[in-house]
Regions:
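NAD(P)H-binding glycine-rich loop region in Rossmannoid oxidoreductase-like domains
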Residues: 1-37, 41, 47-53
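Active-site "gating" loop of Rossmann-like NAD(P)-dependent oxidoreductase/epimerase domains
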Residues: 44-70, 81-86, 103
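Conserved beta-loop-beta element that borders a ligand/cofactor-binding pocket
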Residues: 80-107
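Conserved loop-to-helix N-cap of the C-terminal "lid" that shapes the substrate pocket in Rossmann-like
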Residues: 92, 132, 137-145, 162, ...
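Substrate-positioning beta->alpha
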Residues: 107-116, 128-153, 160-161
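Conserved C-terminal active-site "lid" loop/helix of NAD(P)H-dependent oxidoreductases
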Residues: 141, 199-230
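Mid/C-terminal beta-alpha module of Rossmann-like enzyme folds, strongest
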Residues: 147-208, 243
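Amphipathic terminal alpha-helices
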Residues: 234-252
């Protein structure tokens, strides 16, 4: 393919470190593994599947329900197995929900809709599913970027490893709503509905309701131990930074 040919052409430049963000890591790895020294891919916490362990370590929980993520996860496992058998070693970094300046933050319907943020700012009701509450853990983009930098600068420790990125803790769905209530300075009522109603009428897209179904609390102890990772921003702080950015960009 043209993409593969373009990557092979780039590989001739003999870059020391190659980082893949667009989700094309397997093609990147094949193209660069004989010329680069270190290849790092960005995955997702969701690739581990529905979490049965919280905080969730860097191991398979169950098959990922998102086909694209499942395919990429299998490729990551292949690259981990192949790491060091050619010139390059391989590392994968798995962030949770990415937050902070530069991107509309996750909102209470599991998306990044500016219209939902306007509704939150106006104190409109939020609908959450009944039952035990999910843990939501947005992580600041700068903290995720820092883990990539730590992997680059600690190649031996990072070689052949999968690392979770994440905040120091997560918050419940109700607390997630309260964070926005505090930031916008309004009371945001919460109304609970059945899961049937929630998935049918509130968040019909699995990519949205999964945020309120599967815990998002990565275990970051491995990154702390091997790379010295220490996230700077809490969920409250990174959401506030993202909202400040929206105001600065006149999105709100």
């Amino acid at each position: 393919s043209k993409v593969a040919d373009d990557l092979k052409g780039l590989a001739k430049e003999r870059f020391d470190v190659v980082i893949d963000f667009p989700g094309t890591a397997y093609n990147t790895y094949i193209a660069f593994r004989d010329t680069a020294s270190h290849i790092i891919a960005c995955g997702s916490l969701w690739m581990f599947g529905y979490p049965h362990i919280v905080p969730t370590p860097e191991i398979r929980q169950e098959k990922c329900v998102f086909e694209g993520y499942e395919k990429r996860y299998q490729e990551i496992l292949e690259m981990i197995e192949d790491s060091g058998k050619h010139r390059a070693v391989f590392t994968a970094i798995m962030p949770p929900n990415i937050c902070g300046p530069g991107k509309i933050p996750l909102e209470t319907r599991g998306g990044r809709s500016i219209d939902v943020h306007h509704a939150l700012k106006e104190g409109k009701p939020v609908y959450l599913p009944e039952g035990p509450e999910v843990l939501i853990g947005p992580c600041d983009a700068s903290d995720i970027a820092n883990l990539f930098a730590l992997a680059v600068n600690n190649r031996i420790a990072a070689a052949g490893q999968i690392f979770n990125a994440g905040s120091a803790y997560s918050v419940t769905a109700s607390q997630f709503v309260k964070i926005y209530s505090d930031i916008y300075g309004v009371d945001i009522p919460i109304e609970k509905v059945s899961w049937e109603v929630y998935k049918k009428d509130i968040c019909p897209n699995i990519g949205q309701w999964w945020h309120f179904y599967a815990h998002m609390q990565p275990d970051i102890s491995k990154a702390r131990r091997l790379l010295g990772y220490s996230p700077r921003y809490t969920p409250e702080e990174t959401i506030a930074r993202a909202v400040d950015w929206m105001f600065a960009e006149k999105l709100l």
